[in-house]
Amino acid sequence: MLIRRERTGDTAAIDAVHRSAFADHLASAGSGHRSGPAVPLPDPPEVDLVRRLRDHSGWMPTLTMVAELHNDIVGHVCLTRAAVGPFPVLALGPIGVRTDAQARGVGSALMHAALGAADALDEPLIGLVGHLDYYPRFGFAPGTRLGIVPDQSDWTSHFQIRPLTAYDSEIKGEFRYADPFYCPASP
């Protein structure tokens, strides 16, 4: 497996990664008994989110990575600029692994690469809204333990922070993602 920075020509493969990784959420949300021809599901919101993030000032190309297996992109992660009050910090997400490559350590490899790269750039911390059983294995803990809360109260239960080497305990307050996280998906 190779973890490398995202390149310009990777866009379609990255869209396919997030389409595969998050399609189950759409399928389960739209499940039910229907008659008639199958209607294709729309792209998961993560596909459009990555596209909008690329066009935003918070996009950080040095912290956007893909995982390749046999020259095939099977995973993607991006870190973008966020803020806690006046302090610049990072937000993780989305992170996705194609369903045919899951349970092979791809997600863990992407997480370790992203954390290491952010730490090497002297970033103080990374925030995310994510699964409480997955992210603690990478050192994430509830943001409230460090006095950091998301600016959307309904995110609080799954909001987590990973302090890095440059972390300063003065960083407290409300966490704000890059603007595209708050925009509805394009039709």
Regions from the language model: what does each represent?
Residues 70-71, 100, 163-167:
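Short loop segments at secondary-structure junctions
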Residues 82-92, 102:
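A conserved beta-turn-beta hairpin within the catalytic core of GNAT-like acetyltransferases
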Residues 120-124, 129-155:
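Conserved active-site alpha-helix within GNAT-family acetyltransferase domains
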Residues 2-14:
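A short beta-loop-alpha structural element at the N-terminal edge
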Residues 15-78:
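Active-site rim helix/loop that mediates acceptor-substrate recognition in acyltransferases
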Residues 149-187:
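C-terminal "cap" of GNAT-fold acetyltransferases
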